[in-house]
Amino acid sequence: MRKSIIALTPLMIAPLCWAQEKPNVVIFLVDDMGYSDIGCYGGEIMTPNLDKLASTGVRFTQFYNTSRSCPARASLMTGLYQHQAGIGQMSEDPGTFKKETQRDINDWGSEGYQGYLNRNCVTIAEVLKENGYHTYMAGKWHLGMHGQEKWPLQRGFERFYGILAGAASYLRPEGGRGLTLDNEHLPAPESPYYTTDAFTDHALQFVGEQKDDKPFFLYLAFNAPHWPLQAKEEDIQKFTKLYRSKGWDKIRQERYNRMQKMGIIDKNVGFAEWENRSWDELTEKEKDESAYRMAVYAAQVHCVDYNVGKVIDYLKKTKQLDNTLILFLADNGACAEPYLELGGGKQEDINNPACNNMPSYGRAWAQTSNTPFRKYKCRSYEGGISTPLIFSWNKKLGNRHGNLCTIPGYLPDIMPTVLEATGAAYPETYHGGNKIHPLVGTSLFPAITEKVPSLHEYMYWEHQGNRAIRYGNWKAIRDEAGTEWELYDIVKDRTEKNNLASQHPDVLKKLRNEWEYWAIKYNVLPKHQDSPMLFADTTRTGRPFSKDPHVIPFHGKYLMYYSVPPKGNSGWGIGIAESTDLTQWKPIGSLSPAADYEAKGLCAPGALVRNDTIHLFYQTYGNDKKDAICHAWSVDGVNFTRNATNPIFAPKAGDWNCGRAIDAEVIFAKGKYFLYYATRTPDYVKQIVGVATA
């Protein structure tokens, strides 16, 4: 690596010695991994290379991401809030570009919601390339794919090998979720193939082919352990007996004990409320299948560790390890999708090369992965936004090897940290003169050197209606499923069990006002609706965003229930919005799949108010002739209890219908309930309307 004299910018607040000799920079990013999965954060998964990296580095115990894949990548790559970079919601994926509109469904016509990195931000790669670095990437991009101008080589990287989409098969990535080398799509790889290994091998190839002594930046963004569950059999066998014999209750307790012993969590931290059955309540078959799913997930994490070790070994052999800044972190908390206790997808599809979106390991194991925190990916509770962060730089850490850093930080801090380490200058303009947003993050070095008590006065989050703000010990949050803001003393209560909103209304009001000011300033609240009579639910991805509305008056206001389809054809849900004038609506909650019969989704709601209770009737989705009508009720219009006998209705198949029931509408008249529904003739050709009474 060449030595250079650098000029300090106002951004560089640490001594000049940090960047006198430019270091290499390596960022490892993993996908959907929980806070407590790896060994050095309390996990039982064997991760010896990461554990060793942590022993020679610093572990952050309160580092935060944005709770979702592509928004997290946007923030990490740019040092901005994801909305500033154009990815407030989701990024482009296969099938999201609509020819009829010549527009991606993730492009809402608002600066904060374009679905790809905009031109008012720069990536770490773009900045470092301008400052004398080689720039390489391997792995998952997920920051724009419809048009080469959005690909890695057009955003600062010299070489790229990986996937542009948000998910792909580990064993045979192909089609729109296939592999890309530089600017060329590749055919499906020959078996045996595994993405984690291939990404690392290509990354090391890029670095090894370098002809000069310039420093390099390597961004190695694994798609592991994101679904689908696919791993090498020899790795799976290392974990199957462990999870079958102990189950999630014991695993969770053992993780918790190790985390406290390590100092990862404070002694006063308990467990978040458990949302699932105990392990002993499962059937033997359920235990077998669920333990195997967790074993595959653990094998995916274990393989990541092995490949991190390959990179470290290369740096050692080439005598570059001491002056290489290494960061390891996750894009969000563990993933519970599709929010079923035991996971989504069929058991026989595990390790099926043709699968690229399911199966998954389920809500119970996801909550275990996030021990001891509340919730998971997409939510702004600690389980959704907390990530391990290992910071290693042998040459500069001095006697801080193995330390824990308890000062909170978050993704916008990565870019300023890299700039301070490398001495690179952050531009005011780029992309042909475009004005670049100023950085919102700050360098992590003052936290590592313990020169400051904190890095941020406020920290902010928003994704799909999940909102949060942290101010000192206080954290205010409004969850996608709730109607009110909650308030927690996050130092005393990091598992967010004791809502203090009613005890400290002034604190909550201050934080809400601050969050709303931030949301307006940074394009979090989209301004793209052309008329107050238009409504688009921005809390979920959709195709379209809202349909099948049903409006009822309730408690002096109006409630609207509507279908909210995601990308793809499974996981439909029901959105809830409220209004006082029938034109201005705001989302206040949702119903997501919560049982096996709803695994592929629920939609087409109809509502009825009786005795101050809302009765919601809706259909299951994606089961063809087996789709049926379900029932739930609520006293507040938002929090619903499912009928224990769901599905409650499907017509008996006969000479006039096929046995299917969808699109429910219920009225009460003449002392009876009349259920109107759509069905089909036995040949499944003609759609007709049926009626049933109760």
Task: Name every feature range the model reports, one short phrase each.
Residues 5-10:
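Sec-dependent signal peptide hydrophobic core
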Residues 36-38, 98, 529-663, 667-694:
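Beta-rich carbohydrate-recognition and catalytic domains
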Residues 2-3, 18-485, 490-520, 524-532:
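Formylglycine-dependent sulfatase
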Residues 1-2, 72, 139, 373, ...:
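Short, intrinsically disordered low-complexity segments
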